[in-house]
A protein has these predicted regions:
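N-terminal glycine-rich dinucleotide-binding loop that anchors FAD/FMN and/or NAD(P) in oxidoreductases
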Residues: 41-70, 214-239
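Flavin (primarily FAD) cofactor-binding/catalytic cores of flavoenzymes
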Residues: 1-34, 77-259
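Dinucleotide-binding Rossmann-like beta1-alpha1 core, especially the glycine-rich loop
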Residues: 35, 40-56, 69-95
Length: 259
């Protein structure tokens, strides 16, 4: 019996697998490597994170993105050089071969629990028991369309439903939202000769500022750079995640929204 079952083989699932292996904890990992990145993310997508903040986990046994790029002849910079979706997906597949070569493609279809163990059922028909389960299935299963728009689904889609935007050429498209997905979708629509209009409940759009090494010293001191954004709040959250975890839920949600 494996001590841990990891569900999902994207960046987080692979990072967990690497750490479990480092600690000599027995595990089984299920999923298809980087599936969402390969099949559900839009063509032309660029990561919001900088190169130095796009490594899969922090375990020393996991090669960094910089190492992957150097080995395979791809350009790389800690900051200022956008990372393409396809490059990151290839990096993930390369990492999987090293930290989780025993990845199983079976899908978990049911989880139950008794007093001591979790019971896992796979689509292959196999059933197994484990002490711990890590769910690392990503966010695509949580795509949200407001109920006020549900009756117009014939002409409304969620951004996660599109790999390409070729069919929108020459058409006016309203994009609702002001985050990563919304602004990225608007940019990709524009690149395909569509006419996007962004609707958001904010007076201004806040997007990536210039990387830290391009800012003047006073700005870097007042708002230091971290892997999750600029500012002391983001830096402390990154360096002391256990302290952040103990903050009240409302405070954590507020910080996450503002970072």
């Amino acid at each position: 019996m494996a001590d841990v079952v990891v569900i999902g083989a994207g960046p987080y699932g692979l990072a967990v697998a690497a750490e479990l292996r480092r600690r000599s904890v027995s595990f089984r990992i299920f999923g298809r490597v980087m599936e969402s990145w390969e099949q559900r993310m839009p063509e032309g997508m660029l990561l919001k994170s900088e190169g130095f903040a796009s490594n899969i986990g922090t375990c020393s046994s996991v090669p960094t993105l910089e190492h992957f790029c150097a080995r395979h002849g791809h350009p790389y910079a800690d900051t200022g050089l956008p990372i393409a979706r396809g490059l990151f997906a290839d990096y993930g597949s390369w990492v999987q071969a090293q930290v989780a070569p025993e990845l199983e493609s079976a899908r978990v279809i049911a989880i139950a629990r008794d007093e001591h163990r979790f019971m896992i059922e796979l689509d292959s028909g196999e059933r197994l028991r484990t002490s711990q389960v890590v769910v690392a299935t990503g966010l695509l299963g949580h795509a949200f369309v407001p109920e006020q728009l549900a009756h117009t689904r014939a002409c409304i889609t969620h951004s996660s439903e599109h790999r390409t935007f070729d069919d929108f050429a020459g058409r006016e498209v309203v994009v609702v939202g002001a985050g990563q997905s919304a602004l990225e979708t608007a940019a990709l629509l524009l690149a395909k000769a569509a006419l996007p209009v962004v609707l958001a409940r904010t007076a201004e759009l806040v997007w990536n500022t210039a990387p830290g090494d391009r800012r003047r010293a006073p700005s870097r001191l007042l708002r230091p750079q971290s892997g999750i954004g600029l500012g002391w709040r983001a830096l402390i959250t990154e360096r002391a995640p256990q302290a952040f975890r103990h903050l009240p839920a409302a405070t954590r949600h507020s910080y996450a929204f503002q970072t």
